[in-house]
Swiss-Prot record:
Subunit description: Part of the 30S ribosomal subunit. Contacts proteins S3 and S10.
Family matches, as Gene3D superfamilies: 1.10.287.1480
Keywords noted in UniProt: Ribonucleoprotein, Ribosomal protein, RNA-binding, rRNA-binding
Domain of life: Bacteria
Family in the record: Belongs to the universal ribosomal protein uS14 family.
GO BP, sorted A to Z: translation
PANTHER family attached to this UniProt entry: 30S RIBOSOMAL PROTEIN S14, SMALL RIBOSOMAL SUBUNIT PROTEIN US14M
Function of the protein: Binds 16S rRNA, required for the assembly of 30S particles and may also be responsible for determining the conformation of the 16S rRNA at the A site.
Pfam entry (one): Ribosomal_S14
Protein species of origin: Colwellia psychrerythraea (strain 34H / ATCC BAA-681)
Gene Ontology MF terms: rRNA binding; structural constituent of ribosome
Protein name per UniProt: Small ribosomal subunit protein uS14
PROSITE patterns: RIBOSOMAL_S14
Length: 101
């Protein structure tokens, strides 16, 4: 089980990423655009650097929805490998069953 503070920190990051997504995308478009001048680019870089650090999507970490475990995360289910196996064995995940051949 991950600490509650770690889960809260990730929730805060998710909220910040959603809040600043448009602004960040617009600034990145100016920086990478060929039609903008060097001065405009530099201003965009400075504005991008002044945004909160946690508003970058690369700062987010995929975590299990049940335990908050950061490793062994399966995106398709939103669970760690351990919790996926437990829920699968109880028959709570439709379409999955234990392999047998």
């Amino acid at each position: 089980m991950a600490k509650t503070s770690m889960k809260a920190r990730e929730a805060k990051r998710t909220k910040l990423v959603a809040q600043y997504a448009e602004k960040r995308a617009a600034l990145k478009a100016i920086i990478s655009g060929t039609d903008s001048s060097d001065e405009e680019r530099w201003d965009a870089v400075l504005k991008l650097q002044s945004l909160p650090r946690d508003s970058s999507s690369s700062r987010q970490r995929n975590r299990c929805n049940i335990t908050g475990r950061p490793h062994g995360f399966l995106r398709k289910f939103g669970l760690s490998r351990i919790k996926l196996r437990e829920t699968m064995m109880r028959g709570e995940v439709p379409g999955l069953k234990k392999a047998s051949w």
